[in-house]
Amino acid sequence: MDKKPIILAFCCHYCAYAAADMAGAMRLQYPANVRVLRFPCTGKIEENHLLAAFELGVDGVMVAGCLEGGCHFLEGNLRARKRVERVKQILGEIGIEPQRLEMFNLSSAEGSRFAEIVQEICARIVPLGPSRLRNDNMKIEQGVVEIARQAEMTIKGGTK
């Protein structure tokens, strides 16, 4: 891959985002090509958010939520896992490698684990090469902002 893969990380506010923050506070090294979006719960991440990320041309997507059984919203991370599995199936059907999408569970105290996960997902994406939909990094950056805006509207609207 001539360019570093662009990874979009959908993170739960209470656990994964806090772990990412801890990784930064601990000055742990992980690839800087990961864009983190904070959600109140991974259960608020809709299939269309994940598909929109791939449509933009990101090379990989990770969803990171609370440990199973530890969701602040009870079953949000379980709903997210089902959505991730459905989107992986859709990706395969449209010719995009399903391994470009993965869900991870971690606690807010696992800053080092967050850094490891980012390295793991980047290492998984590099051999796949850039997304066949990737053509303009500026478009991706602007699109990430739009996904964040749409996600905020979804959350405020109270869907699912």
What are these regions (language model features)?
Residues M1-K160:
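Iron-sulfur-associated redox domains of electron-transfer enzymes in respiratory
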